[in-house]
Amino acid sequence: MEENPLQCTICKNEFEEPILLSCQHTTCRKCSTGSPSCKSCSPIPSTSRSHTPHPDKLAAFLLDASKEEMEECANCEQISLPMFYCETCQQSLCLVCRNVTHQARMFSSHKIISSDERSKVYSSSLCKDHNEPYILYCSDVRKLVCIQCFNGRPLEERHSFISIEQGHRLCLERIEQSAAKLRFYQSERQEELNVRQRVLDENASNFDDARASLYQLCQQIIDTVMTTRETLAKELVKQQEQSDEQCKRQIKEIEAVMGPVRLCLFSAQILCTTASKLDVLQLCPQLQKRIGVLLDKTIDKLPVSSTPDSIEVRSDLAKALEPFLGMSAAWCPISVSREGSSSNSYKRGSGSHKAISMLSKFQATIDLAGAFGELFGKVEHPLRQLVTALSSTSQQVLETQRDLTIRRCIIEKEDVEKLVKTCKKIEAGLGMHSAALDGMQSEMQEIWQEQLDRVRRQQIIYREKVEEILNLRETARQILTAAKQLVPYVSCILNMNAMIDPKRCHPPDPAPMESICLEITGIEPNSQNRILAIEKEEENRRLNQEAKKKEELAGQSAVMKTLKHGKIKRKEMNRMMLNTNRERSPGGTDTALTSPCIRRLTTALKEETASELDAEEFLDEIFELSGEQYDEVVDGTLTEEDRCSSALLLSMEISSDSISPLPSLEQLLGRIPLASRVTSNIGFSRGAMLQSLNDVFALQKPPTPENISVSEERNVLASAVRNAEKRKSGAGLPTNSDKDEVIEKEEIEKETEKEKKKVIRRRVKKVSEPSEEEVTTFTFNAPPDCPFVPQEIFESDEKLGTFEAKERVLQSLKQKMNQKTE
């Protein structure tokens, strides 16, 4: 009998202030006071006991709808069925008043419906926040909104607003879908409830039959099997209690779920039929949420029904009767699942095919050999046919039952009668087969007696072997005791030997290579351990080599630290470096030499070594000019070709660890190509060479205020130098008187220069013939340091190119070097 969904399950009365619990049950507020859990499903553990009960709006709405009274007619104030309702006038009308008041043409646009179709609004039609009437429905949050709520939403969220009519249709569709799922859920649970109820009844009848058969069997040998009977009866009762308890618990769970299911279905029916649109829109989310919670609930699977065969009655009784009747449990029917347990070793078989299926082919061949096999073959083949027919018929009966109960199909009567006839035929065949087996029992008894005699003989042999094994075990225990007594003597002797001769106690360790070979040979060819061992040895070998290299480098660095340092480095301010990052002209000349960009060499750029300083001192001594050689100098003015010819005076590459030799005669005379005479470090070698030559020439020919002009600027353009030389070329060559004056002043200046310890580098400009006219002087912009080139090397009427000028200068320097060495 189904309960009223609007009735409390505790007080059995109609709801008063209904509240919703976490288990989806609805009770009265006064019934749930002081109870932390639901009384209907208290045995079921609750997953959310901290859930605070809140009012059940669905139940309250159903209560209000069920108590709705018929309204009186607004015109005659009487109730006469049928009643109508004018939605335009918002008034109730009886049939007479409707015909009287709404017959005029002016009332033709009024919408009049039956009072049964009218849906009364029980909830508020105004917004709680703004006290404005609802005009739209938001499909995202599933709430009614007023004009203020609509204006307060941003523009990107206003796409979810729909009219109340559309929202009403949408909610009705959702309710119908959820209700359909809930109906299907209800049908499944109802079917499970019915199945478990039938299982409960079947278990009761089956266990009653088993108990009766057990008592009948035990009466024959009541004295010997009384204890066994009580034990088996307790096991039966225990299994029955477990099965009944599980079924009852599941039945209680399903019954507890059915109450909220009926309430939700009733709510869905009311909302879809008589509820107003606003009520549907407001209560639809709650109903769907509750339906979803109910659909998520699951019920445990149906417990496996146990039969009396699982208790293994015959096997236990055979074991109990074995001391009295001499019957062994091995003669009982073999079960399908034969395990090693003493109490569950054998089960009753339902046919010979199960016994044979548990045996191997070899065992079946041995057991079926001889006379027993011939007799067994007469009944085995017909029995297999009957088993196949029985299996097919049982499957057909099962499908027919499912068609009737689950699929709700219509079954033809002829089909059922055909199944009944088939079952009767199979039963008759089994009866005939059983009679044939009973007739064969006498013949098989003789065969079994012979086998029993053979078994007895085998048992005698077995007992002899058991006694022999027992004797051997006793002997083994005695030997073990003797061996244990020898252990302290052996350990004492070994300790004394270790004190006397320790080497004999510990065998020598194998060599490293031998241990590696033993380890590798003990590993499988393709094993991971062997690969790891090889990789480990390779890694150790590599680490040893790196350690040796580090030791060698450390020794070399220690030796280098013990060496003496060279001479004191000169100041970096006196070093020059030529910027060689210039493009060369198509004719082969270096444009950087015509107007070189000279810069000071800083410590960060290059550091002089002692060998470089020694090489410069050696060059200073070689290129030192005497006074007689200087007398031959005619003019000290510089031309464009002179400056260019001194650019590649000598090419000398000086490394940090060795000094390159001076250029050979073939290189100076131009017999070897120019490219072989120019080194990669041309900037440094040229600067060192020119610096030494300037020092020598400055000492031999000190400048005077009359014939020099000092240039403080660093750079000078080649075109400016060329124009200045052209302007001075008209003055002529210097006279011999000027030379004498220079020689006399030279000796005086040598002594003063030694005291000053400072070399003043000047560029001297001479005027061939003194005149009262002003001599035009040109201020150089810090020209690069170049050696003084005597004018007598070149003929006055000969115009030489840059390459020829370089060759003339190199030949002159070579001659001076030869004179110096002689």
Curated annotation (Swiss-Prot):
<keyword id="KW-0863">Zinc-finger</keyword>
<feature type="zinc finger region" description="RING-type">
    <location>
        <begin position="8"/>
        <end position="42"/>
    </location>
</feature>
<dbReference type="Pfam" id="PF00643">
    <property type="entry name" value="zf-B_box"/>
</dbReference>
<feature type="zinc finger region" description="B box-type 2; degenerate">
    <location>
        <begin position="122"/>
        <end position="164"/>
    </location>
</feature>
<feature type="coiled-coil region">
    <location>
        <begin position="526"/>
        <end position="558"/>
    </location>
</feature>
<dbReference type="GO" id="GO:0048471">
    <property type="term" value="C:perinuclear region of cytoplasm"/>
</dbReference>
<dbReference type="InterPro" id="IPR039320">
    <property type="entry name" value="RNF207"/>
</dbReference>
<dbReference type="GO" id="GO:0008270">
    <property type="term" value="F:zinc ion binding"/>
</dbReference>
<dbReference type="InterPro" id="IPR000315">
    <property type="entry name" value="Znf_B-box"/>
</dbReference>
<dbReference type="GO" id="GO:0044325">
    <property type="term" value="F:transmembrane transporter binding"/>
</dbReference>
<dbReference type="GO" id="GO:0030544">
    <property type="term" value="F:Hsp70 protein binding"/>
</dbReference>
<feature type="zinc finger region" description="B box-type 1; atypical">
    <location>
        <begin position="68"/>
        <end position="115"/>
    </location>
</feature>
<feature type="binding site">
    <location>
        <position position="76"/>
    </location>
    <ligand>
        <name>Zn(2+)</name>
    </ligand>
</feature>
<protein>
    <recommendedName>
        <fullName>Probable RING finger protein 207 homolog</fullName>
    </recommendedName>
</protein>
<dbReference type="InterPro" id="IPR001841">
    <property type="entry name" value="Znf_RING"/>
</dbReference>
<feature type="binding site">
    <location>
        <position position="102"/>
    </location>
    <ligand>
        <name>Zn(2+)</name>
    </ligand>
</feature>
<feature type="binding site">
    <location>
        <position position="73"/>
    </location>
    <ligand>
        <name>Zn(2+)</name>
    </ligand>
</feature>
<feature type="binding site">
    <location>
        <position position="97"/>
    </location>
    <ligand>
        <name>Zn(2+)</name>
    </ligand>
</feature>
<feature type="coiled-coil region">
    <location>
        <begin position="738"/>
        <end position="769"/>
    </location>
</feature>
<dbReference type="InterPro" id="IPR013083">
    <property type="entry name" value="Znf_RING/FYVE/PHD"/>
</dbReference>
<keyword id="KW-0175">Coiled coil</keyword>
<keyword id="KW-0479">Metal-binding</keyword>
<keyword id="KW-0862">Zinc</keyword>
<keyword id="KW-0677">Repeat</keyword>
